[in-house]
Amino acid sequence: MYQPARMGVGIRLATEDDAAAVAAIYRPYVETTRISFEESAPHDEEMALRMQSPLHPWLVAEEDGRIVGYASSSPYHRRPAYRWTVETSIYVAQGAHGRGFGRILLSRLIELLTAQGYVTAIAAIALPNPVSIMLHEKLGFVAAGTYRGVGFKLGEWTDVSLWQRDLAPRSAAPSEPLPFREVAS
């Protein structure tokens, strides 16, 4: 799956070979912001392990051969009844903000998750983050609620806003989500 998004920019499925670049993009979010609630940045090997789920795709944006952002999906919760709901995340490299990479990544991730058969996508956004909220609103997510003061990092309590997007109608007997490699073109 490689889709040109615009001249010089492409979106593709992430591979384990991308783990170092993805970890490098994520590291400043972990070390200097409350956007991620992790307190220690994962090393390359840990990032590669996170990418291994056959049901939860990761995408990367490449500009002129350099990875400038990624979008990931993960189980919303581990209990089986949640398996039609998926959590999404997007991270863009420092210096690459404001150029549409987040929008392209999240749009393509939503397309893939929909094709897999997921019914609901959830984004958990640490507040304040008006840029992320605006992006999610533009892509059809709606506010579903806010957890107040649920994370303490960098000396501050942080609220988390939950955003939800329906990907498919809710049916009485939903089909199991498909592995992403079966539907990625």
Q: Across the structure, where does each feature detected by a protein language model lie?
A:
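Acetyl-CoA-dependent GNAT
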Residues: 39-95, 106-107, 166-167
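Conserved GNAT acetyl-CoA-binding A-motif
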Residues: 113-125
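Conserved catalytic-core motifs of GNAT/GCN5-like acyltransferases
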Residues: 72, 122-125, 137, 142-159, ...
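Glycine-rich phosphate/pyrophosphate-binding loop shared by adenosine-nucleotide-utilizing enzymes
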Residues: 9, 66-70, 158
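A short beta-loop-alpha structural element at the N-terminal edge
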Residues: 10-24
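Conserved GNAT-fold acetyl-CoA-binding loop/helix
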Residues: 23-49
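Conserved beta-strand-loop-alpha-helix junction that forms the acyl-donor binding cleft
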Residues: 97, 123-133
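Conserved acetyl-CoA-binding loop-helix of GNAT-fold acetyltransferases
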Residues: 98-112, 134-138
